[in-house]
């Protein structure tokens, strides 16, 4: 395939156009008075959302050079969402400001590498300063505050705080679409482990990039499966039952994997394969935990089981299984409660008897998974469109709340970034282009506050000036238009979210500023229509207009 190229200033400006296109679509959602964005879907109703990363993922530009810029900023939003679960719009706004100011300086003759070093140094300093000013989140009321701010709904905030209290801070909280108008919390027996699907072809929910198996059979084995002949007898029995199947094995590869993938793609059978978590003896113990929770028999040669000779009796069951690229969640396993209680008691004894700190930590993790259960929040709404939007908000709020519990909170509403500017006084002792890099970060840090104010109908620059002059933690409540003590008003952001937004924006901006050439595939030109021969008006060659 032929490639086309673009160089230096021309390349960077086309990247900037792409950055602006995506950022302008996303930043209107910032703050409590942010607007919604409607996303067209090929199938079903359109999606209405104010979630930055959801909007960013939908954007593809026709100009291939500009599209590269849009994809780079999409990476900022996605990365921030993956690490902190929120703050995607803030990260996008910061990236846009850093790119704009950076390119202006590059055009004026600044060295991009020097600017990048200055931007990185300033971002690191801001991150350290924010961490130092963070306040721990420990009680239920504080957790509810953080969740309420993220979800912009006090009912959701209370539900998340309740869920965290019941399953523990490290517990699993999942979100499902509800069947009533009310949003409800349900704590069920369940388990989650950090291994995702072996192949993305097992995905059943393209939007969420998840494999969702309802009322599923579960095969748990210590073996590596590579020959389909080993699995075939069992697969045929499961197929007769018309139920989905989750396979947890040391690995599934070769002919076995390709056969499962083909069946999943053809929709002959709903199936998903995941690798077993852990290593060695610990892996075997974790598989035994799963077997007890799901009512399965652990299929292992040393226990007298051969994979090609077992039937449905060795399979466990679960009401629901959700597998994404990183995690597998099993909800409502079909095991006996008494067996699970015995297993929990056994692990507690092992913890007491263990001398190794590491062993105790890993045993405690297994205990939490076995005894904590899974909190399921069912998003209720009057219409499917509203339900999907609410589900998005709840998922964001859960991630933000977990981030707050992990590292603490700072004042929200964009105030923390605007009031952390004194940390950059003296330009960190840097000179030349590195000093300019620090001043670029200084200008960018006010942008989230400016857009929160602007979206709420205020003059952004006037608000920035007022907030920057106030004591730490005092700022604009954009919902009411008043200047308040943000912590007392419950307007807080997880410091992990804010730090990651700054770090990821600085990273992508630095890469973009130091870009000197772009290489993209040459767009295919439309083929000309077949030559037509008209009569009465002479001959017409080529496409007619």
Curated annotation (Swiss-Prot):
Residue spans crossing the bilayer: none
Biased composition (Basic residues): 534-545
Catalysed reactions, semicolon-separated: ATP + H2O + a folded polypeptide = ADP + phosphate + an unfolded polypeptide
Entry EC number(s): 5.6.1.7
Source taxon at top rank: Bacteria
Binding site for ATP: 29-32, 86-90, 413, 477-479, 493
One BP term from GO: protein refolding
Enzyme class: isomerase
Key words of the record: ATP-binding, Chaperone, Cytoplasm, Isomerase, Nucleotide-binding
Subcellular localization: Cytoplasm
Keyword Chaperone among UniProt keywords: yes
Keyword check for Cell membrane: no
One Gene Ontology cellular component: cytoplasm
Region (Disordered): 526-545
Complexes and interactors: Forms a cylinder of 14 subunits composed of two heptameric rings stacked back-to-back. Interacts with the co-chaperonin GroES.
Record-linked NCBIfam families: GroEL, PRK00013.1, PRK12849.1, PRK12850.1, PRK12851.1
Function field: Together with its co-chaperonin GroES, plays an essential role in assisting protein folding. The GroEL-GroES system forms a nano-cage that allows encapsulation of the non-native substrate proteins and provides a physical environment optimized to promote and accelerate protein folding.
Protein name from the UniProt record: Chaperonin GroEL 2
Underlying gene: groEL2
């Amino acid at each position: 395939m032929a490639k086309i190229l673009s160089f230096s200033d021309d390349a960077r400006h086309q990247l900037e156009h792409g950055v602006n296109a995506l950022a302008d679509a996303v930043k209107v959602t910032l703050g409590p008075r942010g607007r919604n964005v409607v996303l067209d879907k090929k199938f079903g109703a359109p999606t209405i959302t104010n979630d930055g990363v959801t909007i960013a993922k939908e954007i593809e530009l026709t100009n291939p050079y500009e599209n590269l810029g849009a994809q780079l900023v999409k990476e900022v939003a996605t990365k921030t969402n993956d690490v902190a679960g929120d703050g995607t719009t803030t990260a996008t706004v910061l990236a846009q400001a850093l790119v704009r100011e950076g390119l202006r300086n590059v055009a004026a003759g600044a060295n991009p590498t020097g600017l990048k070093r200055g931007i990185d140094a300033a971002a690191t300093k801001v991150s350290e300063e924010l961490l130092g000013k963070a306040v721990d989140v420990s009680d239920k009321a504080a957790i509810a505050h953080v969740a309420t701010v993220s979800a912009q709904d006090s009912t959701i905030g209370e539900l998340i705080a309740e869920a965290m209290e019941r399953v523990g801070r490290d517990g699993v909280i999942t979100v499902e679409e509800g069947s009533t108008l009310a949003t409800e919390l349900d704590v069920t027996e369940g388990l989650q482990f950090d291994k995702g699907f072996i192949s993305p072809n097992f995905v059943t929910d393209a939007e969420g990039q998840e494999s969702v198996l309802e009322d599923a059979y579960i095969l748990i084995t210590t073996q590596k499966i590579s020959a389909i002949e080993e699995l075939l007898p069992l697969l045929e029995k499961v197929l007769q039952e018309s139920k989905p199947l989750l396979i947890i094995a040391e690995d599934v590869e070769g002919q076995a994997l390709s056969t499962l993938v083909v069946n999943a793609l053809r929709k002959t059978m709903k199936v998903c394969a995941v690798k077993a978590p852990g290593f060695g003896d610990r892996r075997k113990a974790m598989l035994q935990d799963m077997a007890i929770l799901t009512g399965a028999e652990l299929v292992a040669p040393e226990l007298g089981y051969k994979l090609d000779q077992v039937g449905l009796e060795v399979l466990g069951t679960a009401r629901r299984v959700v597998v994404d690229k990183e995690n597998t969640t099993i909800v409502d396993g079909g095991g006996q409660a008494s067996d699970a209680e015995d297993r929990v008691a056994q692990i507690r004894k092992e913890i007491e008897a263990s001398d190794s700190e590491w062993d105790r930590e890993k045993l405690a993790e297994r205990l939490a998974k076995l005894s904590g259960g899974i909190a399921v929040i069912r998003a209720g709404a009057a219409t499917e469109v509203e339900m999907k939007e609410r589900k998005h908000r709840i998922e964001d709020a859960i991630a933000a709340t977990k981030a707050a519990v992990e590292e603490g909170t700072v004042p929200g509403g964009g105030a923390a970034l605007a009031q952390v500017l004194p940390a950059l006084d003296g330009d960190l002792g840097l000179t030349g282009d590195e000093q300019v890099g620090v001043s670029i970060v200084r200008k960018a840090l006010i942008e989230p506050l400016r857009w929160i104010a602007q979206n709420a109908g205020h003059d952004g620059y006037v608000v920035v000036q007022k907030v920057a002059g106030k004591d730490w933690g005092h700022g604009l409540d954009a919902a009411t238009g008043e200047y308040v003590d943000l912590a007392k008003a419950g307007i807080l952001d997880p410091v992990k979210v804010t730090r990651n937004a700054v770090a990821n924006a600085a990273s992508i901006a630095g890469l973009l500023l130091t870009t000197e050439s772009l290489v993209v595939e040459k767009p295919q030109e439309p083929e000309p229509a077949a030559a037509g021969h008209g009569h009465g008006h002479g001959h017409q060659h080529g496409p007619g207009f």
